[in-house]
């Protein structure tokens, strides 16, 4: 089942492990399918470095760590859908993530040239956070892993902010259905206007705890 998670991996030659305080410790060794399975089982939580050694990315993520984060990301999701680019919403501890998956490795500089203005207009973080260059770059927690500080897992959500599948195992299988896109190679991108959105995530903490309580950890081993 962990094989589906490879599409959420950036750099394969290294990774990081989340500690109890939420920070990450670099592993300095390659990632493996066994480690991805351990991530799903909750034995450890993996952070993946978004940019590869070649300066490319297989995905991009908008990060909104704030109370209205899911509503803002839904707006971005709709904007991208209108342009023909599907994106996938994931809840996080303090807001949400919006993932785009690419059909082929794409230069980080190209991704930031395309999506950077959208992120800046809404005060969102964008991964990749760098346009390439030296260094290992920034990392992001891989989906479905147990956040070591909150003790919770966070699901992918549909437009109504409901989990796309009732169990983690089914959510992982759902990943095989997501559409991979070819990003545009644009010299510059105009910044879209803000939209108002009334979508709210009600009872965030309680809903996540209830969803986690329904999971069978042995089904992920």
Predicted feature descriptions by range:
Residues 47-51, 77-78, 83-91, 124-132:
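Catalytic micro-motifs at enzyme active sites that drive phosphoryl/nucleotidyl and oxygen chemistry
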Residues 1-59, 67-74, 136-139, 144-153, ...:
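DNA replication initiation on ssDNA origins
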Residues 72-82, 101-126, 148-170:
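Helical (often loop-to-helix) elements that flank the catalytic cores of nucleotide-handling enzymes
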Residues 130, 144, 160:
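Solvent-exposed, flexible loop/coil residues
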Residues 61, 77, 86-113, 133-145:
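Histidine-centered divalent-metal-coordination microenvironment in nucleic-acid enzymes
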């Amino acid at each position: 089942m962990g094989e589906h998670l490879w599409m959420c991996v950036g750099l394969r030659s290294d990774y990081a492990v989340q500690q109890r305080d939420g920070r990450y410790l670099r592993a300095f060794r390659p990632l493996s399918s066994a480690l991805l399975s351990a991530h799903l089982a909750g034995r450890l939580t993996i952070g993946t470095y978004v940019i590869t050694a070649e300066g490319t990315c297989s995905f991009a993520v908008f990060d909104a760590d704030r109370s209205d984060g899911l509503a803002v990301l839904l707006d971005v999701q709709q904007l991208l859908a209108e342009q023909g680019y599907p994106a996938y919403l994931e809840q996080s501890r303090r807001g949400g993530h919006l993932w785009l998956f690419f059909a082929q490795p794409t230069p980080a500089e190209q991704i930031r040239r395309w999506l950077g203005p959208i992120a800046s207009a809404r005060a969102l973080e964008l991964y990749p956070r760098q346009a390439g260059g030296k260094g290992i770059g920034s990392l992001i927690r891989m989906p479905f892993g147990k956040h070591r500080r909150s003790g919770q897992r966070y699901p992918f959500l549909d437009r109504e902010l409901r989990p796309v599948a009732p169990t983690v195992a089914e959510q992982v299988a759902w990943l095989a259905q997501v559409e991979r896109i070819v990003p545009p190679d644009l010299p510059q991108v105009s910044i879209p206007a803000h939209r108002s959105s009334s979508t709210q995530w009600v009872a965030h903490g309680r809903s996540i705890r209830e969803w986690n309580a329904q999971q069978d950890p042995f089904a992920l081993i």
